[in-house]
Amino acid sequence: MGQEDLMNRAEDVADQFLRVTKQYLPHLARLCLISTFLEDGIRMWFQWNEQRDYIEATWSCGYFLATCFVLLNLIGQLGGCVLILSRNFVQYACFGLFGIIALQTVAYSILWDLKFLMRNLALGGGLLLLLAESRSEGKSMFAGVPSMGESSPKQYMQLGGRVLLVLMFMTLLHFDFNFFSILQNLVGTALIILVAIGFKTKLAALTLVLWLLVINVYFNAFWTIPAYKPMHDFLKYDFFQTTSVIGGLLLVVALGPGGVSMDEKKKEW
């Protein structure tokens, strides 16, 4: 009984947090989610020559095609971010960013690096949640029109987004055999499974947001490394990728798990 009371109290705290932040949370979630694209687009501008030379050397595609690749990445990412933040053509912006993820996965040989591939897929999961949000906004414009219930594509987008966010967590698992690492893995795994199946979703996602935030600031503090060191760019990449997944989890908190979830099924029972 005491454990149930504790869980109920935690859910009350989460609900109170949502009531206070409901006007700002979706905006913060979108900003966090697109942060990795924003940072990468800006980096393309400041490292134009280095990025072009890398693509030209790796793929032997010539100066012109390498320049087109960098330009496409720059315009595609920054343009997509502007559209998402301004709430214009969000679905087209999401599809464009999906294309950028696919393009970079091939161009930078991420396909063969399981850790980076999983992070890119998790990023895609965040975009799926953003697509689901844009669909719900579109429906709200026709609130007075009778409908057949919540659209199935939106429900499955939310499910797919939640499941793909699990992949990001899996890259953070530590396989050190000490008490803290084992405890961290067990608690984190339990929370991410709850998010994936949609049980106690908002509380689990909010707890994961706080946990990832602490890990991100502690382990990926790129600002403490001089900019000329390779580790600076590596940590910066990790920092913004994790921030994007935090944005995806915040969208889960703001929107709920959707129709394909245990939380929704419980209401029917």
From Swiss-Prot:
Q: How does the protein associate with the membrane?
A: Multi-pass membrane protein
Biological process (GO) annotations held by this record are: endoplasmic reticulum to Golgi vesicle-mediated transport; Golgi organization; lipid homeostasis; lipoprotein transport; regulation of lipid transport
Q: Any domain commentary?
A: The di-lysine motif confers endoplasmic reticulum localization for type I membrane proteins.
Q: Which UniProt keywords apply?
A: Endoplasmic reticulum, Golgi apparatus, Membrane, Protein transport, Transmembrane, Transmembrane helix, Transport
Transmembrane domains' residue ranges: 64-84, 92-112, 179-199, 203-223, 242-262
Can you supply one Gene Ontology CC term for this chain's record?
endoplasmic reticulum membrane
Q: Which family does it belong to?
A: Belongs to the SURF4 family.
Q: Output this protein's name.
A: Surfeit locus protein 4
Motif residue range(s): Di-lysine motif = 266-269
| Primary role | Endoplasmic reticulum cargo receptor that mediates the export of lipoproteins by recruiting cargos into COPII vesicles to facilitate their secretion. Acts as a cargo receptor for lipoproteins bearing both APOB and APOA1, thereby regulating lipoprotein delivery and the maintenance of lipid homeostasis.
Compartments where located: Endoplasmic reticulum membrane; Endoplasmic reticulum-Golgi intermediate compartment membrane; Golgi apparatus membrane
GO MF:
cargo receptor activity
Pfam families attached to this UniProt entry: SURF4
Give a yes or no for keyword Transmembrane helix in this entry: yes
Task: State the species of origin.
Answer: Takifugu rubripes (Japanese pufferfish)
**Database matches in InterPro entries:** Surf1/Surf4, Surf4
Q: Does the keyword Endoplasmic reticulum apply?
A: yes
